[in-house]
Amino acid sequence: MPTNSQDTTVLHALFGGTFDPIHYGHLRPVEALAAEAGLNRVTLLPNHVPPHRPQPEANAQQRLKMVELAIAGNPLFAVDDRELHRTTPSYTIETLEAIRKERGAALPLAFIIGQDSLLTLHKWHRWQSLLDTCHLLVLARPGYNDRMDTPELQQWLEQHQVTDAALLSRQPQGYIYLADTPQLEISATEIRQRRHQGLNCDDLLPRSVQRYIELQGLYR
């Protein structure tokens, strides 16, 4: 997209995940984050081959379809399927650099992660380049420590952390914002296990996604 078509006062956010399946533990905290940080659009990025996790049970097209069903009619969300076309592992920094190049150097850009991911961020591929490309918006997660593993990592966090979300739209990248979002005890692993056991998942994910899972015979 041409750089001159972008509003450089609006923060654009991206949220990656395997989404195997997508559920309310993904959607509800991001909706709360959007209200807290003034986001008007969050683009979901389904992973193809996550480098640090087991292979998904659902295939790429099934996971994309579940994301599309989950966000249908919700103007906050969009989906970008670029990672599903990769044949190599999906490294976050490579995707972010490609999006930054497309959208221009001046656009405020943020990547949403969970608190659990923040604590292991130093194990990610080229993790120290992330803040050269975007801001990090961190969702609260139940049961996780709020401090980094080492004094050096904690210092890195404190050097980049801001508590005023308004600052995120004033520069293109470089900040970390720890959001006060709902901590939902929902995981895709739990949903898959419940499906394997024939248990009800009504309160865990949108009904449209449930219907698709049932029609496709997923997670049996």
Curated annotation (Swiss-Prot):
Superkingdom classification of source: Bacteria
Keywords: ATP-binding, NAD, Nucleotide-binding, Nucleotidyltransferase, Pyridine nucleotide biosynthesis, Transferase
InterPro entries named in the record: Cyt_trans-like (IPR004821), NadD/NMNAT (IPR005248), Rossmann-like_a/b/a_fold (IPR014729)
Reactions this protein catalyses: nicotinate beta-D-ribonucleotide + ATP + H(+) = deamido-NAD(+) + diphosphate
Residue pairs linked by disulfide bridges in the UniProt entry: none
One GO process term, biological-process aspect: NAD biosynthetic process
Keyword Lipid biosynthesis: no
EC number: 2.7.7.18
Pathway(s) this gene product operates in, as recorded in its UniProt entry: Cofactor biosynthesis; NAD(+) biosynthesis; deamido-NAD(+) from nicotinate D-ribonucleotide: step 1/1
GO molecular-function terms, A-Z: ATP binding; nicotinate-nucleotide adenylyltransferase activity
Pfam family, any one: CTP_transf_like
Function: Catalyzes the reversible adenylation of nicotinate mononucleotide (NaMN) to nicotinic acid adenine dinucleotide (NaAD).
Family affiliation: Belongs to the NadD family.
Protein name per Swiss-Prot or TrEMBL: Probable nicotinate-nucleotide adenylyltransferase
Organism: Serratia proteamaculans (strain 568)
